[in-house]
Amino acid sequence: MFCCLGYEWLSGGCKTWHSAWVINTLADHRHRGTDFGGSPWLLIITVFLRSYKFAISLCTSYLCVSFLKTIFPSQNGHDGSTDVQQRARRSNCRRQEGIKIVLEDIFTLWRQVETKVRAKIRKMKVTTKVNRHDKINGKRKTAKEHLRKLSMKEREHGEKERQVSEAEENGKLDMKEIHTYMEMFQRAQALRRRAEDYYRCKITPSARKPLCNRVRMAAVEHRHSSGLPYWPYLTAETLKNRMGHQPPPPTQQHSIIDNSLSLKTPSECVLYPLPPSADDNLKTPPECLLTPLPPSALPSADDNLKTPAECLLYPLPPSADDNLKTPPECLLTPLPPSAPPSADDNLKTPPECVCSLPFHPQRMIISRN
């Protein structure tokens, strides 16, 4: 009883201060201290030993140790109560959080100050540089004007970059549109070519080239008359020269054989003479008269070019190219009598020559009406 009262009397005044000091000096590692013991040990010793002197010595030693702990505090010393540990733990966490917050504030403030100082130093350097440059040129400017001009240049540069980017985007859109139009045009061209090819497949060769037959006929006539080989430019020139006095196209009554023979046989000779009329001098050429001509020399190469080979009263000597160059005209054999001429014959048939053709099983006598 006395020991308990003495302990409370000795430790009552410093109880609050001791608790606060333990809370404030608690270390991060929170393990229990190595103190001598507590009130449960005293009760156990006094009950089991029942020794008065031993109990007094233990109480005295306990009080001395507790007093020494209060005078000489240790890093790990506390009374072992859970309340003190929890309060110390909370305070330590708060203190660490506070230290962390304070450090962050300090670093933030230091960065701000450093940024301001650097900006001020740069401003001073710019001012010094501008003043020196303007002093040479006889001008004085402040750093604010220089910074304003720099900001204006930056804005202009940004505006130019924006315009360039917009132009690039517009150009990309235009190129895409042009590419789309080109694809549409190419598709249309392909469809047109397919349609033309389909149409050409249905057209006959003669319908594709309307002058093909006429050009070929003119080329054959040119080759037969001049003896020259076939060339395209001669064909075109012959066609151009013969288009003026082109003979009328054959009627439907003529057969295929008539058309094939009409290419080789000229239409200058009539198979029978016409009776004389009042206008013979105007219509009848004086080449084919019924009176025989006096004999002349043999025809030469110049005679073929100058004198037309029409209505000769004597047969020509046979040659290898009679079928190509010499038409079978004006033979001496007389023709059988035919029907009397009519008024239409004078309009359609020129009274040029009286000719006779030898009878051949593969040929026919042709009269050009």
Swiss-Prot record:
Pfam families: NPIP (PF06409). Residues 151-170 are annotated as: Disordered. InterPro entries: NPIP (IPR009443), NPIP_N (IPR054697). Belongs to the NPIP family. This is Nuclear pore complex-interacting protein family member A9.
